[in-house]
Amino acid sequence: MFKTEEMLALNLQLFSADVTPINVTTQDGMSPTMKTFYDTALLENAREQMIFTQFGKKQPMHGNKVEWRKFNTFAKALTPLTEGVIPSGQTFGMTKIEATTTQHGDFVAVSDRLELEAYDDVIFGATEEMGATEGETYDTLTRNILVAGNSVAYANDKASRSALTADDKLTPELVAKAATWLKKNKAPKIDGSYVAIIHPSVAFDLRNSEEWKEYHKYNDVAPIFKGEIGELHGVRFVESTASKVFKEGEVATYATLFLGKDAFGILDPEGEGMEMIVKTREQIGGPLNQFSTIGYKFCHGAKILYQERILRVETGSSYSALDEAN
């Protein structure tokens, strides 16, 4: 007689310590030298994308929340004192501004076949692209806070964004008005100038104006900021494709941000800055070591500190019919 044996189906994944590419473990499978190499590649690419963030006042923090305090200003004492009479004096106070951080991150999985058979260094390539995306993400989060500021001016004295057309371009006169607005609000300058963060489509119109051309024909302005393209009326222009584009109907409109010093703050949480995370196939690739992962993670927080030091100027451009919202 033959003995009948029952065959059991085993799920080998039950014996795997980690079967998904999402869980975070240590970096034990990678040498310190390689980890430093990839960390540097990602962070360098991330920093190249940070146009808005470079102008923020960095605030170190140890938790999830920070509080800025700014003292109220005093009125001028223009009335002469009366002999023997004590003046009423002024009240001293301060304004409190609070902000918290949010955590963001993403990753990509690279298969063992692609990693082993590709001609290029796939891990390094993915790290570079992840770094660029990390920087763009961080800077866009900062931009979204800044474009929500209270102070706005529309080109050609239009009443609202919806009234703007492609003909309502950013002009040298409008630049001068924005600079005057900052001066009247006593906004301090950034390294001797105000700064405007401008979209390439808007910069195209401004740089084609006769006043811009004449100024730069006789003035050799050395750039001091990342992305800087020139200066006009005491304003240094910094170009960014991340500058906000709105699209209502068929016309794209653009937000150019004019800034004074310390107009906004950037939170710098201790131990929660930009982090590059690489997991080898041995660490994360399941029972058959089928993939590795490359990702990033960071905490972000930003807050407008002085509404009177930031002006959003909304205009159209020669590309209003072509550009999409971002």
Annotated model-derived regions:
Residues 16-49, 164-177, 208-326:
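Sequence/fold signature of self-assembling virion shell proteins
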Residues 72, 112, 298-302:
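Beta-strand elements of well-folded, non-transmembrane domains
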Residues 97, 102-118, 122, 179-209:
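Structured, hydrophobic secondary-structure cores that serve as assembly/anchoring elements
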Residues 113-185, 312-314, 318-325:
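Alpha-helical scaffold segments that mediate packing/assembly in large oligomeric complexes
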